[in-house]
Protein backbone atom coordinates (compact mmCIF):
# COMPACT_ATOMS: atom_id res chain seq x y z
CA UNK A 1 0.00 0.00 0.00
CA UNK A 2 2.87 2.29 0.70
CA UNK A 3 4.18 1.67 -2.83
CA UNK A 4 0.84 2.62 -4.33
CA UNK A 5 0.72 5.73 -2.19
CA UNK A 6 4.12 6.90 -3.45
CA UNK A 7 2.83 7.26 -7.03
CA UNK A 8 -0.05 9.51 -5.94
CA UNK A 9 0.66 13.19 -5.31
CA UNK A 10 0.82 14.26 -1.67
CA UNK A 11 -2.39 16.27 -1.79
CA UNK A 12 -4.23 13.29 -3.16
CA UNK A 13 -2.94 11.04 -0.35
CA UNK A 14 -4.18 13.40 2.32
CA UNK A 15 -7.72 13.49 0.92
CA UNK A 16 -8.24 9.73 1.20
CA UNK A 17 -9.38 8.55 4.64
CA UNK A 18 -7.33 5.83 6.24
CA UNK A 19 -8.71 2.35 5.47
CA UNK A 20 -9.74 -0.08 8.13
CA UNK A 21 -8.89 -3.53 6.78
CA UNK A 22 -11.07 -5.23 9.40
CA UNK A 23 -14.20 -3.69 7.86
CA UNK A 24 -13.49 -4.90 4.34
CA UNK A 25 -15.55 -7.92 3.38
CA UNK A 26 -14.42 -10.52 0.97
CA UNK A 27 -16.84 -11.95 -1.53
CA UNK A 28 -16.86 -15.49 -2.72
CA UNK A 29 -17.26 -16.28 -6.34
CA UNK A 30 -20.85 -17.09 -7.19
CA UNK A 31 -21.16 -20.60 -8.49
CA UNK A 32 -24.16 -21.74 -10.47
CA UNK A 33 -25.84 -24.81 -9.03
CA UNK A 34 -25.80 -27.95 -11.06
CA UNK A 35 -28.58 -28.54 -13.62
CA UNK A 36 -30.11 -31.31 -11.48
CA UNK A 37 -30.21 -29.00 -8.46
CA UNK A 38 -31.95 -26.30 -10.50
CA UNK A 39 -34.56 -28.77 -11.72
CA UNK A 40 -35.13 -30.04 -8.17
CA UNK A 41 -35.40 -26.49 -6.83
CA UNK A 42 -37.87 -25.59 -9.60
CA UNK A 43 -40.00 -28.63 -8.83
CA UNK A 44 -39.90 -27.77 -5.13
CA UNK A 45 -40.80 -24.13 -5.87
CA UNK A 46 -43.71 -25.11 -8.12
CA UNK A 47 -44.93 -27.65 -5.58
CA UNK A 48 -44.85 -25.09 -2.78
CA UNK A 49 -46.43 -22.44 -5.00
CA UNK A 50 -49.21 -24.89 -5.90
CA UNK A 51 -49.75 -25.63 -2.22
CA UNK A 52 -49.83 -21.91 -1.44
CA UNK A 53 -52.26 -21.12 -4.25
CA UNK A 54 -54.45 -24.08 -3.30
CA UNK A 55 -54.57 -22.75 0.25
CA UNK A 56 -55.43 -19.24 -0.96
CA UNK A 57 -58.17 -20.55 -3.24
CA UNK A 58 -59.53 -22.78 -0.48
CA UNK A 59 -59.59 -19.84 1.93
CA UNK A 60 -61.35 -17.68 -0.64
CA UNK A 61 -63.83 -20.46 -1.36
CA UNK A 62 -64.52 -20.86 2.36
CA UNK A 63 -65.02 -17.10 2.67
CA UNK A 64 -67.58 -17.20 -0.13
CA UNK A 65 -69.35 -20.15 1.49
CA UNK A 66 -69.45 -18.24 4.77
CA UNK A 67 -70.88 -15.19 2.99
CA UNK A 68 -73.45 -17.40 1.29
CA UNK A 69 -74.52 -18.88 4.63
CA UNK A 70 -74.68 -15.42 6.18
CA UNK A 71 -76.82 -14.21 3.27
CA UNK A 72 -79.17 -17.18 3.67
CA UNK A 73 -79.52 -16.56 7.41
CA UNK A 74 -80.08 -12.86 6.83
CA UNK A 75 -82.70 -13.66 4.21
CA UNK A 76 -84.49 -15.99 6.64
CA UNK A 77 -84.33 -13.36 9.37
CA UNK A 78 -85.83 -10.78 7.03
CA UNK A 79 -88.60 -13.22 6.09
CA UNK A 80 -89.37 -13.68 9.79
CA UNK A 81 -89.39 -9.93 10.27
CA UNK A 82 -91.66 -9.57 7.24
CA UNK A 83 -94.11 -12.07 8.75
CA UNK A 84 -94.02 -10.20 12.05
CA UNK A 85 -94.64 -6.90 10.25
CA UNK A 86 -97.57 -8.43 8.35
CA UNK A 87 -99.08 -9.72 11.62
CA UNK A 88 -98.61 -6.33 13.26
CA UNK A 89 -100.22 -4.63 10.26
CA UNK A 90 -103.15 -7.06 10.35
CA UNK A 91 -103.62 -6.53 14.09
CA UNK A 92 -103.44 -2.77 13.66
CA UNK A 93 -106.11 -2.90 10.95
CA UNK A 94 -108.31 -4.99 13.27
CA UNK A 95 -107.81 -2.49 16.09
CA UNK A 96 -108.62 0.42 13.79
CA UNK A 97 -111.77 -1.37 12.62
CA UNK A 98 -112.85 -2.04 16.22
CA UNK A 99 -112.14 1.58 17.12
CA UNK A 100 -114.24 2.71 14.15
CA UNK A 101 -117.06 0.44 15.34
CA UNK A 102 -116.80 1.87 18.86
CA UNK A 103 -116.58 5.50 17.69
CA UNK A 104 -120.38 6.13 17.71
CA UNK A 105 -120.57 4.84 21.29
CA UNK A 106 -117.60 6.97 22.29
CA UNK A 107 -119.29 9.98 20.72
CA UNK A 108 -122.47 9.19 22.69
CA UNK A 109 -120.41 8.94 25.89
CA UNK A 110 -118.84 12.33 25.18
CA UNK A 111 -122.27 13.84 24.48
CA UNK A 112 -123.71 12.34 27.69
CA UNK A 113 -120.72 13.69 29.61
CA UNK A 114 -121.36 17.18 28.21
CA UNK A 115 -125.07 16.89 29.05
CA UNK A 116 -124.25 15.74 32.58
CA UNK A 117 -121.92 18.70 33.01
CA UNK A 118 -124.65 21.07 31.73
CA UNK A 119 -127.23 19.40 34.00
CA UNK A 120 -124.87 19.72 36.95
CA UNK A 121 -124.46 23.44 36.25
CA UNK A 122 -128.24 23.78 36.00
CA UNK A 123 -128.62 21.93 39.31
CA UNK A 124 -126.14 24.32 40.99
CA UNK A 125 -128.02 27.32 39.57
CA UNK A 126 -131.35 25.85 40.67
CA UNK A 127 -129.92 25.18 44.13
CA UNK A 128 -128.65 28.75 44.37
CA UNK A 129 -132.01 30.10 43.15
CA UNK A 130 -133.93 27.92 45.62
CA UNK A 131 -131.74 29.20 48.46
CA UNK A 132 -132.48 32.78 47.42
CA UNK A 133 -136.19 32.02 47.29
CA UNK A 134 -136.05 30.36 50.68
CA UNK A 135 -134.25 33.36 52.09
CA UNK A 136 -136.89 35.71 50.60
CA UNK A 137 -139.69 33.50 51.92
CA UNK A 138 -138.25 33.54 55.43
CA UNK A 139 -137.80 37.28 55.17
CA UNK A 140 -141.40 37.74 54.10
CA UNK A 141 -142.62 35.35 56.75
CA UNK A 142 -140.98 37.38 59.49
CA UNK A 143 -142.88 40.53 58.48
Curated annotation (Swiss-Prot):
Region of interest: Disordered: 1-36
Modified residues (N-acetylalanine): 2
Coiled-coil region: 80-128
Location of the protein in the cell: Cytoplasm, Cytoskeleton, Microtubule organizing center, Centrosome; Lysosome membrane
Keywords, in A-Z order: Acetylation, Coiled coil, Cytoplasm, Cytoskeleton, Lysosome, Membrane
GO biological process: anterograde axonal transport; anterograde synaptic vesicle transport; extrinsic apoptotic signaling pathway via death domain receptors; lysosome localization; melanosome organization; mitochondrial outer membrane permeabilization; neuron projection development; organelle transport along microtubule
Basic and acidic residues biased stretches: 11-36
GO annotations of cellular component type: axon cytoplasm; BLOC-1 complex; BORC complex; centrosome; cytoplasmic side of lysosomal membrane; cytosol; gamma-tubulin complex; mitochondrion
Predominant location: cytoplasm
Signal peptide: none
An example molecular function term from Gene Ontology annotations: gamma-tubulin binding
Pfam families per the UniProt record, alphabetical: BLOC1_2 (PF10046)
InterPro entries: BLOC1_su2
Role this protein plays: Component of the BLOC-1 complex, a complex that is required for normal biogenesis of lysosome-related organelles (LRO), such as platelet dense granules and melanosomes. In concert with the AP-3 complex, the BLOC-1 complex is required to target membrane protein cargos into vesicles assembled at cell bodies for delivery into neurites and nerve terminals. The BLOC-1 complex, in association with SNARE proteins, is also proposed to be involved in neurite extension. As part of the BORC complex may play a role in lysosomes movement and localization at the cell periphery.
Family: Belongs to the BLOC1S2 family.
PANTHER family named among the record's database cross-references: BIOGENESIS OF LYSOSOME-RELATED ORGANELLES COMPLEX 1 SUBUNIT 2
Oligomeric and partner information: Component of the biogenesis of lysosome-related organelles complex 1 (BLOC-1) composed of BLOC1S1, BLOC1S2, BLOC1S3, BLOC1S4, BLOC1S5, BLOC1S6, DTNBP1/BLOC1S7 and SNAPIN/BLOC1S8. Octamer composed of one copy each BLOC1S1, BLOC1S2, BLOC1S3, BLOC1S4, BLOC1S5, BLOC1S6, DTNBP1/BLOC1S7 and SNAPIN/BLOC1S8. Interacts directly with BLOC1S1, BLOC1S3, BLOC1S4, BLOC1S5 and SNAPIN. The BLOC-1 complex associates with the AP-3 protein complex and membrane protein cargos. Component of the BLOC-one-related complex (BORC) which is composed of BLOC1S1, BLOC1S2, BORCS5, BORCS6, BORCS7, BORCS8, KXD1 and SNAPIN.
Name assigned to this protein: Biogenesis of lysosome-related organelles complex 1 subunit 2
Organism: Mus musculus (Mouse)
Amino acid sequence: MAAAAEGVPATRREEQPPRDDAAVETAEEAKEPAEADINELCRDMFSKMATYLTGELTATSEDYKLLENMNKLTSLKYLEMKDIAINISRNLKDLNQKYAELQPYLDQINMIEEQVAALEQAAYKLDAYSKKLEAKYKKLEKR
